[in-house]
Amino acid sequence: MLEHLDGLSTATPGDENTYLHKRLMLEVLGENVSSLDERLHEELLRRVMGTSLWLCHEDIARLVVQFCVNLMSTHTGSMLATCLEMLVESFLPPRGYPAGRLEDELETFMRSGQSPSPMRNSSVDMDEDSSARGDGDLGPPPRSAAETTVIVVGAITQILTLVPLSATVLRGVLLRRIPHKTAVKARQCQYLRAAFALVETPAGRPLRDGLLRGVLRHLLD
């Protein structure tokens, strides 16, 4: 079973058999989260929640998010912290994201006040992605920061709505994950854009004051 959860970030419909197996496995897992045990199924959980929402295909991203939301609605405890850590970590792109793309999107946003259209079929993006990953299975072209932020914030707001306890856990995660002051500007800005997008939602609004205080301390350091 675990082999079908390998390479979720790079799976594409082009490899029909493998892709369908991965999709089916995620669908089954998402419908049976109540049967999962954190200790007995640690490796399975690690593989699913380790999927990059920046790099994976749209269908895979949707199923991974649904898995996390379903998991949190039936399990709390340390699983809640683990899942929220993974989602907040996804505010920022992983290793393998095309170099310069985050900076380009920030520059566009600063100039026009709008993020680039979240399209994933640009040949430029494909070329950058090929050079960044440098392996045989390149997977789908990466999505933009704007598109990924919508996916991640949507998942977290669902969890906040379904699991009221999650707000207490998330408050600490949001502050702890703020990039270090030495991090490049684009990463710091992307994290804060995602965090503020979250706290401006009805579900995330109770976290707004705490985030503002944390960001102020971060700026004064």
Placement of each model-derived feature along the sequence:
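Internal amphipathic alpha-helical repeat/solenoid segments
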Residues: 1-60, 80-92, 102-109, 125-129, ...
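Boundary/linker elements of alpha-helical solenoid repeat scaffolds
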Residues: 20-33, 45-46, 62-72, 134-139, ...
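Alpha-helical repeat/alpha-solenoid scaffolds of the HEAT/ARM/MIF4G superfamily
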Residues: 77-118, 139, 143-221
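Intrinsically disordered, low-complexity serine/threonine-rich segments
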Residues: 115-117, 122-123, 130-131
